[in-house]
Amino acid sequence: MSHHWGYSKHNGPENWHKDFPIANGDRQSPVDIDTATAQHDPALQPLLISYDKAASKSIVNNGHSFNVEFDDSQDNAVLKGGPLSDSYRLIQFHFHWGSSDGQGSEHTVNKKKYAAELHLVHWNTKYGDFGKAVQQPDGLAVLGIFLKIGPASQGLQKVLEALHSIKTKGKRAAFANFDPCSLLPGNLDYWTYPGSLTTPPLLECVTWIVLREPITVSSEQMSHFRTLNFNEEGDAEEAMVDNWRPAQPLKNRKIKASFK
């Protein structure tokens, strides 16, 4: 049953706990970021993002989003600094989005939903590989970036132009020479808290770093995301929309801010 999770009524986030009991755990993601209670922590360092040698390889429809995958066999694209004590290697990025522009993000800010959310997924190199890292409480660092409606994003355009070739689950296409820096906002102020993967197996292995400044995307660009399908080729067509998990209880955690 575990591989049948999704985002519909019968297999969506409300039901994930049946197969993945950690869904009700103490450090689940996403969360609502309440800016009034997030505490500025002067000890937090600036983020150090070195994506200059990032080697993108392919773009894949996995039936719940699409991943742009990177060569993580060496330190090509690295995230460190911020709340992190170690160096983390970029393995993939993906997005979550809505059926309309009024929803789609997983994290919310004072309950406000953005049109989409970008997740750049990195693993802690001290654990040797991604599979080992996800078993550790400090195994992953995920950089979350909100997408809000405004002027079109040039960086995003190259990604969107590849989507026609991966319309259905299981499709994969080559996707080289993409610079993930083109998806970063100008300001790297962030919130950070300990959390989890937002999709099954929902492992509690993520240091979340959510940027305060969104990037902008046009409404027309957003509509491209919705041309993808959850289903495999030849099956009944199900538009890939609303592939986001709602905010989870913060429980005993504190959200820290890198800015005043």
Curated annotation (Swiss-Prot):
Its EC number is 4.2.1.1, 4.2.1.69. Zn(2+) binds at residues 94, 96, 119. The keyword Nucleotide-binding does not apply. It catalyses: hydrogencarbonate + H(+) = CO2 + H2O; urea = cyanamide + H2O. Keywords: Acetylation, Cell membrane, Cytoplasm, Lyase, Membrane, Metal-binding, Phosphoprotein, Zinc. One of its GO terms (cellular component) is apical part of cell. InterPro entries: CA_dom, CA_dom_sf, Carbonic_anhydrase_a-class, Carbonic_anhydrase_a-class_CS. Its cofactor is Zn(2+). It is found in: Cytoplasm; Cell membrane. This is Carbonic anhydrase 2. It comes from Mus musculus.
